[in-house]
Structures are given as structure tokens and as C-alpha cells.
Swiss-Prot record:
Pfam families associated with the record: Beta-prop_IFT80_2nd, TPR_IFT80_172, WD40
GO terms of biological process kind: apoptotic process; articular cartilage development; bone development; bone mineralization involved in bone maturation; bone morphogenesis; canonical NF-kappaB signal transduction; cartilage development; cartilage homeostasis
Organism encoding this protein: Rattus norvegicus
Positions of region (Disordered): 758-777
Known role: Component of the intraflagellar transport (IFT) complex B, which is essential for the development and maintenance of motile and sensory cilia.
PANTHER family linked: INTRAFLAGELLAR TRANSPORT PROTEIN 80 HOMOLOG, OUTER SEGMENT 5
Disulphide bonds in the chain: none
Name listed for the protein in its UniProt record: Intraflagellar transport protein 80 homolog
Polar residues bias locations: 765-777
WD repeats: 12-50, 104-143, 145-185, 186-225, 227-265, 267-306, 504-542
């Protein structure tokens, strides 16, 4: 990826350009110390003077009023705030009319920024004050006051906090009066510029120490650059938070969100005092010290999938290369390419007006449909369909171009959704809520309606990343997510009545990805690269989960690596320095998944015997129990040395009825409640009481015996035997109450138990067992 620079031979301004701002993706306004505001039209390459300001007004900062989201096409911003050296800020219309001038600070007003909703304006000045203003320019509050100038300011993603500079310090101050203020030393020189992205919640800072840095919202440094030759005078995030630009003397740099540099350009611009990204994130404009306005387009973005490599060579041209035979195809587009995604044998490209869908089998005939709004901010793909996110909503389309659904939820803000907070599978869409980050919304892909009974997935901590598995049946669909403590959890997306368990899979997990061909999960866990060959094992046999893992040292990937993709058995990891590392994992677990999904149990056992890996046997054991194939489970558990479980499975074979076997399989997986329910529904009250006795669940055993008026003496007898074994006295009031005057006769109890078992066996053999449990013999 690099920047394609365009610079006029002669500058349009006579003095330094202090600030620039985009109205649409093709129109820019620039302000200069020559008191002129100039409009640039990039389609016609024309410039026109909008207004000449009075000679005593030297503009310093410009920010357009935020456009209303969700309106068809790109609504143009109609007014902007201009801060100036005379201590005022000016509200100016698009046509150049000064609507209002407000005395704001003593000395120059160094920066002014609208919040994301356009309901408030923050200004900072040489007098060290941070002030909040209403939309119409009425003072609401003075947020902060200090003895040194505040050079730059930025709103937090929720518009509830403000970030500003204080010499070498950065300060995050909430608007609530008594809330905690976060302050830290960020640079060794005065901080000149800051920016805070609403999508990734990361902070940029630039200082006179010639460095730029990336921070999280807690003030932890994620990246610090090497010192440059000159002070860094400007930084700016791309709207989607994936890239940022850095400006210095004769220097323009394009960087990834993690800090490493994609491209360095050395245009003849003087210092770049201000950088603005276009609304679609494809180009930047810089305000230059020598009167120029520099424009740069982001080109040579690259997408890879299996043997295909797609490169954006020009704004409207892509090159597709098949690395197997070196065949090259050129794709021409009518409009500028904004976003693209290559996955699941399809390339999806959005331009400013249309969406193109190419199949990797045929690059010549794309499917084309018009977009509701021009600026697509996110494309996600699944095997059967893909998701587009723009300012107006979320839209699901098939690869034939057919519109499928558009999920909606209260307070939806599409401008802050990214690949970490939205996940797509063949039947489900998962979206993390921004208002309450502990909640995940789950939707049916086919209808866009909430999944199941409409219950939300709620967690005890804030969630940072979500991912749906890609294969298998809808009822078995799982979602994995990482919370703010870096713990990895897994749960079922099926939300009918009973609350599904959320189970922890790992700790200190930084990034995760599901395989696209089978339900294998991988993640970078502290200093380890971990692959969960069968994550579903947590619901079947939690004890065997550690044996189903593959782990290797990940210290070679340095700090903060990120998993880019997991295709087949190939995992691609992006290191902190920007380099890509490919990791190959064993292909056998994927083959095992395929055999099991086709119920080819003999082939699965044969594969495990051939490979002779404990992790594969452990996976097969858990898969067999999940699919109620206890013959295969017995073989697999024996292979991993779990003799106690082999004996338990053997004991199940002697159980008199299918219901009892089913109940004991559920108990084997830890589902005690379901096991008891199955027995009670089948009328096997004694068996239900006995499993509670075996688990020392005395309260429940007595409760069932009393409720069904049977085997009270059996429960009391086993309780007495238990107390005698441990040399204890009875203290439970209910047991004391029922034991009064009851003579325990073990002969009678054993005869009654034998009768129950005989009755159950007879009923089973005569075919009266009404419920088919789907149990494999």
C-alpha cells in the first residue's frame, strides 16, 4: 500500500495553509494566512475563492459540522466552525457567509471540534482553557483551565469524554463534573496534535520530540515511532480506523493502525500543519507551510485468498493474479474503489455508487447492483452471502446480488462497526452493542430478525471482539468472544428459554479466528499460539479439552501480533512490524471434522490410528460423545488413557432402557438437570432419585422421593449409610423429620430396587419406550 501524491506546480494560497476539510469525497475547503477560504473540486480540478476574511482574522483550525447519517447518498455538510488568532470562533456556511462570531478565548483559539452527533463544540486556546459550546455557539461550560496553551483536542467515541494536550501531557476528561480524569506523560516535547478514532477507540499523538505514538483509551502506549528529523505537526485517523496519516516537514507518512509504516512520501510542501481524510477513506489532503494543498490517494492495497492476489493498482483499476499459473486479469471500474473483500471464492468490491461481485472462477462477468448510500465502511463475507455496512444501515446480499435482509437494533450506529465488532456466518449475524459493550445482538441472516426468542447475549464484562463459527448446523452454531480482560469465552447462539452457558476457553487472548472450512478455532494467547481443534468439547467433556489443543511458542511474532485469516490449515499472522507470517497446522483435524459430520465413524477411527496423535483421539472421543456414539467414544477414550471413562461407558451398556442410557450420557457431559428431566419424563422416578444419591445431592433426592411418594426409605437408607461411613450425625431437619419412626430394612429396599430395574427392562424390551432418543447402539 502506498500514497499517490498530486501537487500543483504553483500554490493557490500566498501564505501558509493552516487547515483543510472535506465536504464530500470530491470537494475540499482550505484556509490560509492570506485570509482566503478556497474550494477545491477534485472531479473538475477547479478551485474557487469562497470568501476573503478580514485582515485581522488568521484562520487556525476548521471542522465541518457532522453530516446526518442514514440519508440517501452523501449529504453535504452545510456549515463549518473556523477558529482564528483573534480569540474567536466563527460559524460559517458552505457559501462563505459568517453566520456567527463568538469571543471564545484570550489569545488564539488553537482548535475547535464538533462532537459526533453535532450537538456540542469544544474549543481550546492559548489561554489554557477547554470550553464546551452548544450547536448555536452558546457557552455551556469551561471544562478545564491550565497555565499552558492547549494545542489540540479530540472527542471520545461516545462524545462523553474530551482528550486535550497540556504541554508534554495528555489528559482525558469526562464531561460529568466528578468523573475521574486520566492524565499521563506522552512525549518528551510539547504535544502538537491529537486524534481519537471512534471505530477502534485508539488515540494518536504527535509532538515536538519528532515522534508519533498510538495509545489505547486507558493511556497505554501501543506504538512509539523512532524520532524523525523534524517535529510531527499533524496526525489524522482514517474514518474506518484501519489507517492513519502523519505529517511533518516535507514528509507525509501512511501507517497501519498498529503503528508500522506502509509508505513514506517526501513532497515539497514545507511543514504539513493539518491532515484531513476524505469521507470514504480513500484519499487525504494536507495543509502545507508553503501555500500548497497536497492530495494523496491510497493505492496498491492488496487482498489475498488461497492462490489469488488482488491489487488496487489505480483508483478505478484492480489487478488479479493467480499465483499457480501467473495468469493476470485487469478489472476496470466506472467509479473510485472504496472497499473490497476477497474470501469464499468471491471478490466483493464497492465503489462510490455500485457494488461488484466477482467469482474467482470467472473474472469477466461481475454481478453489479446499485448502492443505497455511497460510502461502504465494511464488507464481511460468509460462504453463502456477504454483508455491507454504510452510513444508512447493515445490508445482507447473496452472491447473486439478491437483497436478503437488513438487521436493525435500538441506537444502532453503523459508522463505528468494524470486523472485530461484527461477525457473519451462513445463518447468523452477531453485532456488539456500542451503548452497552457487555451485550451482543444476534440476528437470523435470512430475515434480519432477532435470533430465537429475541434474548440478547449478555456477558459480565465489556466485550472487545466477536467471532461466529462458519460450519455446521444452525442449532450447533457457536460464538467466541474476547472481553476487556482478554479472556476468551464460547457459547451457543441458540437462545430458547434456558440460558446457555458461557464457558471460558482461555486467558490473555489477544486475537482469534475461526477456520473457514471447519469449526477449528485459533488464537494468540499470551506468548503461545493456540489452536482449539474441537472447541465444542467444553460442552461434552471439559476434562478432555486440554488434550484437544495444539500449542506452539509465539514469542517470534513480537508484541501485539494480529491474526489476519484462517483459511484451510493456513493461519496468517501480522506481526507488529507489519510483516506477514504464515503458520501451517495439521490437516488431520479438519479431515476428522469432515468424517464426523458425515457420520463416517469407522473412517474417523482409522484416521486416528494412522496419525497416532493424542489430540486427534481426544477430539474423536468428545465428538463421539456429542453425537451419542458410545462405541467410538470407548475406543477413543481408551486410546488417550482415560480408563475411568471407558469403565463408565461400559457400565452404561448394562443399563436396562434407552432413557437411562441417554440420561447417563448427559451426566457424562455434566448435564445433570437434563439427565434428571429425561428420566422423570419417561416415568423412571427411581433412576432420577438414584442419580441424585450418587452425586450426593441429598436435598433433591429426598424432594423427588416425597413429591412422587416413592423410595423415601431408599433415600433415608443411603443417607444413613453415608453418615455412618464418615462418622457424622444427621443435622438436616427434613431428613430428621422423615426418619422419625421409620425402620430401615435393607433387604426390603434391595428387593424394591431390583423390582424397579426388572420393570424398566421389561418395559424397554416390549417396545413401550415411547421416546426415541437418537442414541446409537
Amino acid at each position: 500500500m502506498r500514497l499517490k501524491i498530486s501537487l500543483l506546480k504553483e500554490p493557490k494560497h500566498q501564505e501558509l495553509v493552516s487547515c483543510v476539510g472535506w465536504t464530500t469525497a470530491e470537494e475540499l475547503y482550505s484556509c490560509s494566512d492570506d485570509h482566503q477560504i478556497v474550494k477545491w473540486n477534485l472531479l473538475t480540478s477547479e478551485t474557487s475563492l469562497i470568501v476573503k476574511l478580514p485582515d485581522d482574522i488568521y484562520p487556525i483550525d476548521l471542522h465541518w459540522f457532522p453530516k446526518s447519517l442514514g440519508i440517501k447518498k452523501q449529504t453535504q455538510a452545510e456549515s463549518f466552525v473556523l477558529t482564528s488568532s483573534d480569540g474567536k470562533f466563527h460559524l460559517i456556511s458552505k457559501l462563505g457567509r459568517v453566520e456567527k462570531s463568538v469571543e471564545a478565548h484570550c489569545g488564539a483559539v488553537l482548535a475547535g471540534r464538533w462532537n459526533y452527533e453535532g450537538t456540542a463544540l469544544v474549543t481550546v486556546g492559548e489561554d489554557g482553557q477547554v470550553k464546551i459550546w452548544s450547536k448555536t455557539g452558546m457557552l455551556r461550560s469551561t471544562l478545564a483551565q491550565q497555565g499552558i496553551p492547549v494545542y489540540s483536542v479530540a472527542w471520545g467515541p461516545d462524545s462523553e469524554k474530551v482528550l486535550y494536550t497540556a504541554g508534554k501531557q495528555l489528559i482525558i476528561k469526562p464531561l460529568q463534573p466528578n468523573a475521574k480524569v486520566l492524565q499521563w506523560k506522552a512525549h518528551d516535547g510539547i504535544i502538537l496534535k491529537v486524534d481519537w478514532n471512534s471505530v477502534n477507540d485508539l488515540i494518536l499523538s504527535a509532538g515536538e520530540d519528532c515522534k508519533y505514538k498510538v495509545w489505547d483509551s486507558y493511556g497505554r502506549v501501543l506504538y512509539g515511532s523512532q524520532p524523525h528529523e523534524h517535529p510531527i505537526t499533524s496526525v489524522a485517523w482514517a474514518p474506518d480506523g484501519e489507517l492513519f496519516a502523519v505529517g511533518s516537514f516535507h514528509t507525509l507518512r501512511l501507517c497501519d493502525k498498529t503503528g508500522w509504516s506502509y509508505a513514506l512520501e517526501k513532497p515539497n510542501t514545507g511543514s504539513i500543519f493539518n491532515i484531513a481524510w476524505s469521507i470514504d477513506g480513500t484519499q487525504i489532503a494536507g495543509a502545507c507551510g508553503n501555500g500548497h494543498v497536497v492530495f494523496a490517494h491510497v493505492v496498491e492495497q492488496r487482498w489475498e485468498w488461497k492462490n489469488f492476489q488482488v491489487t488496487l493498482t489505480k483508483r478505478r483499476t484492480m489487478q488479479v493474479r493467480n499465483v499457480l499459473n501467473d495468469a493476470v486479469d485487469l478489472l476496470e471500474f466506472r467509479d473510485r474503489v472504496i472497499k473490497a473483500s476477497l474470501n469464499h471464492a468471491h471478490l466483493v468490491v464497492s465503489t462510490s455508487l455500485q457494488c461488484y461481485v466477482f467469482s474467482t472462477k470467472n473474472w469477466n462477468t461481475p454481478l453489479i447492483f446499485d448502492l443505497k448510500e455511497g460510502t461502504v465502511s465494511l464488507i464481511l463475507q460468509a460462504e453463502r452471502h456477504f454483508l455491507l455496512v454504510d452510513g444508512g444501515g447493515i445490508y445482507l446480499h447473496s452472491y447473486e446480488g439478491r437483497f436478503i435482509s437488513s438487521p436493525k437494533f435500538p441506537g444502532m450506529r453503523t459508522d463505528i462497526l468494524n470486523a472485530q465488532t461484527v461477525s457473519l456466518s451462513n445463518d447468523t449475524i452477531a453485532i456488539k452493542d456500542k451503548a452497552d459493550e457487555k451485550i451482543i445482538f444476534l440476528f437470523e441472516a435470512s430475515t434480519g430478525k432477532p435470533l430465537g426468542d429475541g434474548k440478547l447475549l449478555s456477558h459480565k464484562n465489556e466485550i472487545s471482539e466477536v467471532a461466529l463459527d462458519q460450519k455446521g448446523l444452525t442449532n450447533d452454531r457457536k460464538i467466541a468472544f474476547i472481553d476487556k480482560n482478554r479472556d476468551l469465552y464460547i457459547t451457543s447462539v441458540k437462545r430458547f428459554g434456558k440460558e446457555e452457558q458461557i464457558i471460558k476457553l482461555g486467558t490473555m487472548v489477544h486475537t482469534l479466528a475461526w477456520c473457514d472450512t471447519c469449526n477449528i478455532l485459533c488464537g494468540l494467547q499470551d506468548t503461545r499460539f493456540t489452536v482449539w481443534y474441537y472447541p465444542n468439547a467444553v460442552y461434552v467433556d471439559r476434562d478432555i479439552l486440554p488434550k484437544t489443543l495444539y500449542e506452539r511458542d509465539a514469542s517470534e511474532y513480537s508484541k501485539n501480533p494480529h491474526i489476519v485469516s484462517f483459511v484451510g490449515n493456513q493461519v496468517t499472522v501480522r506481526r507488529a512490524d507489519g510483516s506477514l507470517v504464515h503458520i501451517s497446522i495439521s490437516p488431520y483435524p479438519a479431515i476428522l471434522h469432515e468424517y464426523v459430520s458425515s457420520s463416517k465413524w469407522e473412517d474417523a477411527v482409522r484416521l486416528c490410528r494412522f496419525v497416532k496423535e493424542q489430540s486427534l483421539w481426544a477430539c474423536l472421543a468428545a465428538m463421539a460423545v456429542a453425537n451419542r456414539d458410545m462405541v467410538t467414544a470407548e475406543i477413543a477414550y481408551a486410546a488417550v488413557g482415560e480408563i475411568d471413562k471407558v469403565r463408565y461407558i461400559n457400565a452404561m451398556k448394562d443399563l436396562p432402557s434407552r432413557e437411562s442410557k441417554m440420561a447417563h450420557i448427559l451426566m457424562f457431559s455434566g448435564n445433570i438437570q437434563e439427565a434428571e428431566t429425561i428420566l422423570l419424563q419417561a416415568g423412571l422416578v427411581y433412576q432420577a432419585i438414584q442419580i441424585n444419591i450418587n452425586l450426593y445431592n441429598w436435598e433433591r433426592a429426598l424432594e423427588l422421593a416425597v413429591k412422587y411418594k416413592t423410595h423415601v426409605d431408599t433415600v433415608l437408607a443411603y443417607r444413613q449409610k453415608f453418615l455412618e461411613t464418615f462418622g457424622k450425625q444427621e443435622t438436616n431437619k427434613r431428613y430428621l423429620q422423615y426418619a422419625e419412626g421409620l425402620q430401615i430394612d435393607w433387604e426390603k429396599i434391595k428387593a424394591k430396587i431390583e423390582m424397579e430395574i426388572t420393570k424398566e427392562r421389561d418395559r424397554s424390551s416390549s417396545g413401550q419406550s415411547s421416546k426415541n432418543t437418537g442414541l446409537k447402539p
